[in-house]
Amino acid sequence: MIVGLGTDIVEIERIEQKVPQAGDHEALAKCRLAKRVLTESEMAIFVASSKPGRYLAKRFAAKEAAAKALGTGIGRGVSFQHIEISNDANGAPQVNFSGGAAERLALLSGVRGHLSIADEKHYATATVILES
């Protein structure tokens, strides 16, 4: 049964304006927006990415969609750090919850989140479905 649904869209250029150039690992590691949004493992991928702004935009959209599916948005006990986006062995995106996000998922009797991320030239979008 579906217990939550969330979607988000991000203008990639808006994020890219706040991100240092690819290859500048030191500056990327200090990027304030990335440090706020990304977990430690996501940050390592971001710093090594050839398109860090696009990577961050997609993760931002995915985390916002997940927070909306939880019914809280970011805040009210759920932070960006409580939602981690990874990829399985086939490259499919996965959403994982910890802390306040995991607590909220349990309150909804949720057991799993399904994530779809898409991007094109100007926009990144994500949808999360939570199931019980």
UniProtKB/Swiss-Prot annotation:
GO annotation (BP), single: fatty acid biosynthetic process
GO MF term set: holo-[acyl-carrier-protein] synthase activity; magnesium ion binding
Organism listed in the record: Shewanella sediminis (strain HAW-EB3)
Protein location: Cytoplasm
Residues engaged in binding Mg(2+): D8, E64
Stated name of the protein: Holo-[acyl-carrier-protein] synthase
Catalytic activity: apo-[ACP] + CoA = holo-[ACP] + adenosine 3',5'-bisphosphate + H(+)
Keyword rRNA-binding attached: no
Cellular compartments per GO CC: cytoplasm
Residue ranges of the TM segments: none
Gene name tied to this protein: acpS
EC number per UniProt: 2.7.8.7
InterPro entries per UniProt: 4-PPantetheinyl_Trfase_dom, 4-PPantetheinyl_Trfase_dom_sf, ACPS, Ppantetheine-prot_Trfase_dom
Chief site of localization: cytoplasm
Names of the cofactor(s): Mg(2+)
Keyword vocabulary terms for this entry: Cytoplasm, Fatty acid biosynthesis, Fatty acid metabolism, Lipid biosynthesis, Lipid metabolism, Magnesium, Metal-binding, Transferase
SUPFAM superfamilies, per database record: 4'-phosphopantetheinyl transferase
Physiological role: Transfers the 4'-phosphopantetheine moiety from coenzyme A to a Ser of acyl-carrier-protein.
Protein origin, superkingdom: Bacteria
Entry's family note: Belongs to the P-Pant transferase superfamily. AcpS family.
Coiled-coil segments on the chain, per record: none
